[in-house]
Every structure is written in structure tokens, then in C-alpha cells.
């Protein structure tokens, strides 16, 4: 059953409600950049695009390095002979991770489905299915436009022998990122695509399936292709993909009783972020990070060329961590694997320790094409460490730090910050000079409030981990953390963005407001409010999409819910129709499929509406949401190995425990009354909505 209106068409659920997770349209956007993307942790493309990308496969030296374009065999468009005018619909089903194109006429229905297999990450596939309507018998032919050319500007492609009916090409990237650096070889097998498929007169229905396997070894490509063929023969290729997506959604969902566009935005954001993470149950998955435009984007000159920024660690990571800590760990492992490059970056700039690149690709060396960002936008190093800190407090996974390289990274970052600080005799505190803050309108400034606060947090975390592991804490870490300057105007009671900032000066994006969240820098609520009031009117209206999400979190913290709602509503000008693809700037400029903006928006709900805050000892909650939302449900919150479901209304809160391996279990503690509720697996608790926290219950006998 479906409803139509304004060129869009929505799926209607059994209860008569439109399904917020299914986006359908009778036409495609005129700008092809706004087409839906289908990706998994290894492969990605935009539908109807002639290229695909492989995670971690870049071509080009230093600032020229970009995702290597690989010709896409899944770039196929279904058409019908002239004279036939079927009803046409295009659908992105975020529940199943599948894009489909449907042609319906009085005599037949033809459907084209395309997907990147979520659990068999080396596979992309598409199918064509034709159903005959009752009372018809003539042959039905659907034409397939497949403009595939086995060429690439980034790979030295050669043809190999066919394998199990598949064509085979392989080739190495042309230019390494650094001299002597890796030049991966890509191997691709694909089912040849005919010019047309025909449902013969004696057939009622038929499906044709087409497979593409991509890997960095011939052996893996062939193994994956054979596995795909076996699933096809068993009729389970697509169903195994949709089962993987169903399991993902069971362990992670955000829904609410409120406006449909808000619900759709949440499903869209989660779909595009979940598409990027390793499949569940694959520890050790060799992950290559998440770029602002995702794996589908990042060809030369597009979407920051597929490089990884703070967007991953600050904007995307917290959402992944809250639901899937194993996937969050894979993101951190990418930073650990590129630590060697970060050590060299610091050394080249004359500092100790590790300086993470503003733009990172395969090696951790700086690949930003403009020197100033790599030299001055150094808050990235603290942003990386904050992700490690959030992970540590959420999971208590000591193995990552003790044996898997985490501690080496933490201590190297602490060394970097100490070496980057200089003592000011005049002010009797440490300065960090000559930086570019998150607000990129300003550079070569001293004592960026955000940069210095994130450096302080890095040092405090490093000292805390050292104490946990009984490692002597260098006195320098403690001193630098204690005495680093975070600019504060005691008269106006607000944080100037940097030394010499004049109130009213324009700001590109959220900067000082990030002190409150995610940094949780200690401050009085009056100061938090003043920072919001000071910077909101001077922040660029059409700036990056995550900006207003962070202002919204601030106002929600202060319980000014309607003010928060007004700011969150601004985000909708960055969401495009019909597939909910985000653009970086509201005027349509900048990166497309902007996962960073989606991450910020999700945080506004996941950490703003709920009041979730990850601290050293607990997971705090303090709900507040605007009047047009009557109920919020967050399924699959992960904390210390447990899985929780929060159902929140303005009057009542319910926490259900779906998994709790801990003994003693977790408990919920209310802030004001001190009331405690043990959280046992399979049970739920409820209480009047109030602030509180989830923490480990004290051991019996203590």
C-alpha cells in the first residue's frame, strides 16, 4: 500500500503510518551527487555511478592522494522499449540496506535491486526480477544500460582469465602516498551484464542476479565470488544481507513519537553511518577509517578526496560507540596503525610525541594539500585521544591499551602536548601558540580555548590511564594539564575563542560551545549559557552542518528546549530529498553524503534529548526534549558489556536490560533522591523522568 504526494511516494505500514525508514520517490534528484549510496565497511558506490571505491585504497602522493577510482560493474540502469510507459519508483530501504528501482505496467512489474553486502564485505550485487501480471502471456523484455569500461585513472588495470563465468581484471595503484609506501593491487571479478533480459511466455516470474567481488588479493576475490555464487544458488544472497541489516537495527535504533521528517532524518543518518562500520563479530577487521563523505565519495577533487579528519573521531565516533563498541574499537585501531606517521609528523614540526594529521589516508602522514591546516589545526590530536577516552570509560577494555598499542598512542599524544606548550612568565601558565581553532576563519592565534581545553583533557586522561596501569606518571603531564591557559573573561563570564578575540567577531562553526559538550570542560551553567548567547548570533548561518546540533545540545543541557528545537530545525536545510543525503553547507556547497553533519545531528538526539554523558565512573542521563516530541526510544545502548533500551517520556522513564553479563550487575541511580535500581538481564525498571546515571553496582559485602 502506498501514498503519493508532491512527487514523493511513501511506504505505509500496517498501522496506516508512513514508514520513516523507507524513502521512495517517483523521480531521481537532478543533481546526481544526491543519489543514495550503498556501502559496507570495504566497498562503496553511489547508485548509477560509474566508479566504486575500496576502503584504504588511495592513489597519489601526499596532498594529491585520493580514493582510487575502480570501474563499477553495478552501474546498471533498467529501461523498457519505447512506447511502454510504466510507473517508475525509486526506493532506499534503510531497514534492508537496499536501493531499488521499480517499473510497473498493466502487464508486468520489473524490479532492480542493488546493495553492498553487509557481512560479505567483498561483494556488491544487483538483481533484476520480472513478474508477469495475471492474464498476460507475451514475452517481456527489460533493457539494461551498462556503460561499464574496464579502465581507471588510478590503477594499472589488466585483464585476467575468466573465473566461474566471471570476467576478471586486476591492477596496482599508480603512485604511493609516500615514497616507498604501499601500492595496493585491486582484483575484481564480475558477472557479465547482457543488454537485455527476457521473461519468456511460459514463465510467470524470474530473477537474474549479478555479482561483483573486489579484494586486494586474487585468492580473496575468487573466494568471495565463489561464496556469492553458492549463496545465489541457495537463494540466500540477498536474504543473508537483509538478515545482517535486521540484526544491526535490533542492536541499535533511535525512534520517537514526533514529526515524521525528524524520524526520517534519524533513520537516514543511522543508515549512512551504520553502512560504514565493520560487520558484527569480526574483531581484528582491518579498518581504514571514515571520511566525511564516506566510502562512496572521495575521488580526486571530491569530498576532501576521501581523507579522514576529526570528523571521524569527534562527530561520527560517539554515535558508533554508544551502540557498537566493537566497531568503535576498529576506528581506534586505524589511529593506532597510523601512529608511526603521526610520530613522524611531530618530529618534522620539531615536537616530541605524536601529532595526528589534519587529513589522514593510508599512512598517518599529513596529506592535507594546504600546509596551514596540518601545521596549525592541531586540536585533531586531542580529538583523537578524546575518542580513546570515551571508549575506555564506556568499555573498560584494558587490552586495547595494555597490549594492542593504545597506551603507546596515549603517551605519545601526552608528550606532544607537553612539547607544544611554552611557559609564559608574565601569566604564569602554559600557552599553546600559533594555532588554527575549529573556527577556520582564524589562524595563527594563541591559546584557542578549544585547543587548550582538549590538550588539558588529553593530559588528564593519559595520567589517569597510567595510574590504572601502575605506570609512573611524568610530573610534566600533571603540571602542563594543571597550568595550561584556557582563556576566560571574568567580567563578561564567557570563554573568548582565543587571546584577543573581540565579541561579535564572525565565527565559521561551533568552536567554544564544544567546551560544554563534548569536552565537558568544568564551568558554571551561567558561563555555559553566556558562551551560547555570545557565539550563536555571530556563527556563520550557512556553515558546516554539525554546528547547530552542538548549540542545540547546549540549550538542552540548560533545559531551554524550544530554543534547542529552533536550532536543530536549521539542520534540515542540509538534508536533501528524496534519499536524505546531507550536504556540508546549507547552500549545497562543500562535501556531499556528509556523514559529519549526520553524526552531529544524531548526537543532538542521542546525547542532547537523553542527556547522556560518558564519564570516568558512569553513564549519566538527564532527559530534555522539545514539545513536539512526546516519547523517545533508544535501543541498544552499550555500557560495560551490557545492552540497554531507554524509553523516555516527559513524565516517565523505563530502562530495559537486554544483555548484562556483569556480576554484580549495573544499577541506575537517581541524582536527587539517591534511589538505586539494580539492572538485571531480561528485566526493566521505571521511574519518574529525572537525572541519574548507570554505573557498576557495588560488590556485595562492601
Curated annotation (Swiss-Prot):
Can you tell me which residues bind substrate? 310-311, 508-509
Pfam families in the record? Glyco_hydro_65m
Q: Which GO terms describe its cellular component?
A: cytosol
Q: Give me the gene this protein comes from.
A: PGGHG
Q: Where is the active site?
A: 440 (proton donor)
Q: Does the keyword Hydrolase apply?
A: yes
Q: Which organism is it from?
A: Gallus gallus
Mind listing the UniProt keywords for this protein, alphabetically? Glycosidase, Hydrolase
Q: What is the protein named?
A: Protein-glucosylgalactosylhydroxylysine glucosidase
Name the job this protein performs. Catalyzes the hydrolysis of glucose from the disaccharide unit linked to hydroxylysine residues of collagen and collagen-like proteins.
User: Which major enzyme category is it?
Assistant: hydrolase
- A Gene Ontology MF term for this entry? protein-glucosylgalactosylhydroxylysine glucosidase activity
GO BP term, example: carbohydrate metabolic process
For this protein, the Enzyme Commission number is 3.2.1.107
Q: What reaction does this catalyse?
A: (5R)-5-O-[alpha-D-glucosyl-(1->2)-beta-D-galactosyl]-5-hydroxy-L-lysyl-[collagen] + H2O = (5R)-5-O-(beta-D-galactosyl)-5-hydroxy-L-lysyl-[collagen] + D-glucose
Q: Which family does it belong to?
A: Belongs to the glycosyl hydrolase 65 family.
**Which SUPFAM superfamilies does this entry report, sorted A to Z?**
Six-hairpin glycosidases (SSF48208)
Amino acid at each position: 500500500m502506498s501514498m503519493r504526494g508532491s512527487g514523493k511516494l511513501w511506504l505505509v505500514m500496517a498501522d496506516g503510518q508512513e514508514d520513516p525508514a523507507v524513502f521512495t520517490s517517483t523521480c531521481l534528484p537532478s543533481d546526481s551527487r544526491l543519489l543514495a549510496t550503498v556501502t559496507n565497511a570495504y566497498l562503496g558506490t553511489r547508485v548509477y555511478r560509474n566508479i566504486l571505491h575500496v576502503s584504504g585504497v588511495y592513489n597519489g602522493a601526499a596532498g594529491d592522494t585520493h580514493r582510487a577510482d575502480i570501474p563499477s560493474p553495478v552501474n546498471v540502469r533498467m529501461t523498457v522499449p519505447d512506447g511502454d510507459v510504466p510507473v517508475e519508483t525509486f526506493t532506499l530501504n534503510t531497514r534492508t540496506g537496499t536501493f531499488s528501482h521499480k517499473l510497473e505496467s498493466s502487464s508486468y512489474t520489473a524490479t532492480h535491486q542493488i546493495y553492498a553486502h553487509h557481512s560479505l564485505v567483498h561483494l556488491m550485487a544487483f538483481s533484476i526480477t520480472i513478474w508477469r501480471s495475471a492474464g498476460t502471456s507475451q514475452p517481456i523484455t527489460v533493457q539494461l544500460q551498462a556503460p561499464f569500461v574496464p579502465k581507471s585513472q588510478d590503477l594499472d588495470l589488466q585483464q585476467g582469465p575468466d573465473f566461474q563465468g566471471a570476467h576478471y581484471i586486476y591492477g596496482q595503484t599508480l603512485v604511493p602516498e609516500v615514497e616507498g609506501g604501499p601500492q595496493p593491487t585491486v582484483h575484481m571479478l564480475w558477472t557479465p551484464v547482457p543488454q537485455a533480459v527476457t521473461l519468456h511466455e511460459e514463465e510467470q516470474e524470474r530473477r537474474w542476479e549479478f555479482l561483483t567481488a573486489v579484494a586486494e588479493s586474487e585468492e580473496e576475490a575468487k573466494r568471495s565470488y565463489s561464496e556469492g555464487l553458492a549463496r545465489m544458488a541457495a537463494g540466500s544472497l540477498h536474504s543473508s544481507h537483509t538478515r545482517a541489516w535486521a540484526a544491526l537495527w535490533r542492536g541499535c535504533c533511535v525512534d520517537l513519537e514526533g514529526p515524521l521528517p525528524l524520524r526520517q532524518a534519524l533513520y537516514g543518518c543511522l543508515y549512512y553511518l551504520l553502512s560504514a562500520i565493520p560487520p558484527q563479530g569480526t574483531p581484528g577487521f582491518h579498518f581504514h577509517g571514515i571520511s566525511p563523505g564516506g566510502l562512496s565519495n572521495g575521488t580526486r577533487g571530491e569530498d576532501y578526496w576521501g581523507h579522514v579528519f576529526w570528523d571521524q573521531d569527534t562527530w561520527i565516533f560517539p554515535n558508533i560507540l554508544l551502540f557498537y563498541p566493537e566497531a568503535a574499537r576498529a576506528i581506534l585501531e586505524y589511529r593506532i596503525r597510523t601512529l608511526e606517521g603521526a610520530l613522524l609528523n611531530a618530529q618534522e614540526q620539531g615536537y616530541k610525541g605524536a601529532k595526528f594529521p589534519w587529513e589522514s589516508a593510508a599512512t598517518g602522514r599529513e596529506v592535507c594539500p594546504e600546509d596551514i591546516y596540518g601545521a596549525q589545526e592541531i586540536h585533531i590530536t586531542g580529538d583523537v585521544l578524546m575518542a580513546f577516552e570515551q571508549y575506555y570509560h564506556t568499555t573498560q577494555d584494558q587490552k586495547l591499551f595494555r597490549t594492542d598499542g593504545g597506551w603507546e598512542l596515549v603517551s605519545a599524544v601526552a608528550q606532544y602536548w607537553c612539547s607544544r606548550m611554552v611557559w609564559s612568565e608574565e601569566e604564569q601558565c602554559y600557552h599553546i601558540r600559533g594555532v588554527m581553532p575549529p573556527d577556520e576563519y582564524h589562524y595563527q592565534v594563541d591559546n584557542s580555548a578549544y585547543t587548550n581545553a582538549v590538550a588539558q583533557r588529553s593530559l588528564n586522561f593519559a595520567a589517569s590511564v597510567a595510574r590504572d596501569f601502575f605506570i609512573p606518571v611524568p610530573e610534566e603531564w600533571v603540571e602542563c594539564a594543571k597550568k595550561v591557559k584556557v582563556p576566560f573573561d571574568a567580567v563578561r563570564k564567557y570563554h573568548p575563542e582565543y587571546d584577543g578575540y573581540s565579541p561579535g567577531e564572525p565565527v565559521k562553526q561551533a568552536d567554544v560551545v564544544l567546551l560544554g559538550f563534548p569536552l565537558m570542560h568544568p564551568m558554571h551553567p551561567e558561563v555555559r549559557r553566556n558562551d551560547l548567547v555570545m557565539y550563536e548570533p555571530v556563527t556563520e548561518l550557512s556553515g558546516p552542518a554539525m554546528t547547530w546540533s552542538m548549540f542545540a545540545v547546549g540549550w538542552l543541557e540548560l533545559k531551554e528546549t524550544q530554543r534547542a528545537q529552533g536550532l536543530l530545525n536549521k539542520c534540515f536545510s542540509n538534508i536533501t530529498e528524496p534519499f536524505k543525503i546531507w550536504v556540508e553547507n546549507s547552500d549545497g556547497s562543500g562535501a556531499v553524503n556528509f556523514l559529519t553533519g549526520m553524526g552531529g545531528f544524531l548526537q543532538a538526539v542521542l546525547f542532547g534529548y537523553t542527556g547522556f554523558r560518558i564519564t570516568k565512573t558512569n553513564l549519566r542521563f538527564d532527559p530534555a526534549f522539545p514539545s513536539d516530541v512526546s516519547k523517545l526510544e533508544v535501543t541498544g545502548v552499550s555500557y560495560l558489556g551490557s545492552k540497554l533500551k531507554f524509553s523516555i517520556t516527559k513524565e516517565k522513564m523505563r530502562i530495559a536490560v537486554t544483555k548484562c553479563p556483569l556480576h554484580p550487575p549495573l544499577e541506575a541511580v537517581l541524582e536527587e533522591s539517591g534511589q538505586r535500581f539494580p539492572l538485571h538481564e531480561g528485566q526493566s525498571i521505571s521511574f519518574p523522568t529525572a537525572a541519574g546515571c548507570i554505573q557498576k553496582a557495588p560488590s556485595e559485602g562492601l
